[in-house]
A protein has these predicted regions:
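Soluble ligand-binding/transfer domains with enclosed cavities or grooves
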Residues: 14-298
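N-terminal chloroplast transit peptides
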Residues: 1-12
């Protein structure tokens, strides 16, 4: 039996960190959630929303997922579309248990261990009233003889959520955008970095960037996934090897001349905390470094 300890560097979170988090995520975000397999095959696409409500005068936030169960499109100019939705509570947290890392106009949740034993990592970048979230899962792979601790984590399902703040969602509709990927030229702007090993409340270091090239290619052991019509792409490790840093990259072009890029270095399967003949308990995965670049074409 394998168990991965689920842990994160929490503790008291300064009010400034809480404000940065709510400024970035509060509200109801509607859009299209596209789920791809590790080979890039589109597995599912749905209309959904995420609502983060922050209690007045309290450092408490409640998270709710909203799924469209049925929709009816009007066939006349003076009529309205209608839809039925289902809501699913997705937990709550307070300022002193905030697990999000905030870095410029981006954030990261995880890496963390799910009940299934898989590792999950969520990355998000925001531009105006729009954002893109990426959630990637990695499943443990056993050793060659099937005994002992796993030697790697294999990339599984990946979900891109292209969303806009309600009520602006009707006007923005990220899923209908046509912003093909275009990395040509050089780029300049700012880069926010949380140095290793960051705590959720850490302050990002800001540096200027000029003459940067944004060519995005998958490495030999990496997978390039993209939604070209929405200007979204990601380079993810096909496998995360035990105790070796792995780089996850999310890029988004909300306009032809604007790019947001989030790069996260993570580590998993670090060391065996407890190991017996029947079970192995591994140290939790951790975020080593987080960088968010906000760039414009020169």
């Amino acid at each position: 039996m394998l168990a991965l300890l689920s842990g994160s560097a929490l503790g008291l979170v300064p009010s400034t960190h809480w404000r940065r988090f709510t400024d970035l995520h509060a509200g109801e975000w509607r859009g299209r959630w596209s789920t791809l397999g590790p080979d890039g095959t589109l597995l599912d696409e749905i209309s959904a929303a995420q609502r983060l409500e922050v209690a007045a005068n309290e450092d408490v936030a409640t998270n709710t997922l909203i799924f469209v169960s049925q929709s009816v499109r009007s066939d006349c100019e003076t009529c309205f579309d209608s839809e039925e939705t289902k809501e699913m509570p997705a937990g709550s947290f307070s300022a002193d248990t905030l697990p999000y890392y905030i870095c410029g106009q981006g954030s990261a949740l995880g890496p963390r261990v799910l009940r299934s034993g898989a590792m999950s990592f969520e990355a998000c970048v925001r531009h105006g009233d729009e954002r893109v979230r990426l959630t990637a899962q990695f499943a443990p792979e056993p050793s060659a003889d099937g005994s002992g601790a796993p030697v790697s984590l294999a990339l599984g399902r990946v979900t891109f959520a292209c969303e806009a703040l309600a009520p602006a969602a009707a006007a923005l509709v990220p899923a209908a955008r046509d912003v093909p990927l275009d990395w040509d030229g050089t780029w300049a702007g700012g880069r926010h970095t949380l140095v290793a090993p960051p705590s959720p409340a850490a302050e990002a270091v800001v540096t200027a960037v000029t003459g940067a090239s944004l060519a995005l290619e998958g490495a030999a052991e990496a997978t390039l996934l993209a939604l070209p019509s929405r200007g979204v792409s990601a380079v993810l490790p096909a496998r995360i090897l035990a105790a070796q840093p792995a780089l996850l990259t999310l890029s988004w072009q909300p306009t032809a001349g604007t790019t947001l890029r989030l790069e996260a270095s993570v580590e998993a399967l670090g060391r065996s905390v407890v190991s017996t003949e029947s079970s192995t308990v591994m140290s939790p995965p951790r975020l080593l470094e987080l960088t968010v670049s906000e760039l414009r074409r020169e």
